[in-house]
Amino acid sequence: MVTELPYALDAETPLNPSELNVLKAQYDREGEMVGVQTKFNYAWGLVKSNQRNDQQLGVRLLSDIFRVSPERRRECLYYLALGNYKLGNYGEARRYNDLLLDKEPANLQASNLRSLIDDKVAREGLMGVAILSGVGVAAGVVGAFLLRNARKR
């Protein structure tokens, strides 16, 4: 079992198509009796992908491993956090990451990911406020224009 977790940046570096095809072929070859390590390797390759559908499948496979393989839960927590972070599911990413940090408060990779999640949530929250403010200003301008035109008639 892997004890050292990758940093979040590694999730942003997709495998090349031939590498992902090797993992998929192994996964497909094992069929219904797919091994946990094979499934995990394929799931991680999918999470690293730039394709949203691949990332979603990777998260589903990791969720399956988490449910059926207690010995892999530590790893799965982190990889599920990374996968959900890449998908923009920041609440889920934080939930999985916090479960890992509860068990391992000194885990540098999980701490780093927590900072990335918090930064992304803060940035998107500010963007949301800016968008709502812009919509409010636009509505005010349109309302004032309509009111002004109504008074002229």
From Swiss-Prot:
Cytoplasmic face of the membrane: 1-125
Q: What is this protein called?
A: Mitochondrial fission 1 protein
Side Mitochondrial intermembrane, residues = 147-153
One of the Pfam families matching this protein, by short name: Fis1_TPR_C
The way this protein sits in the membrane is described as: Single-pass membrane protein
Q: What SUPFAM superfamilies does the database record attribute to this sequence?
A: TPR-like
Report whether Transmembrane helix shows up as a keyword of the record: yes
A Gene Ontology biological process term:
peroxisome fission
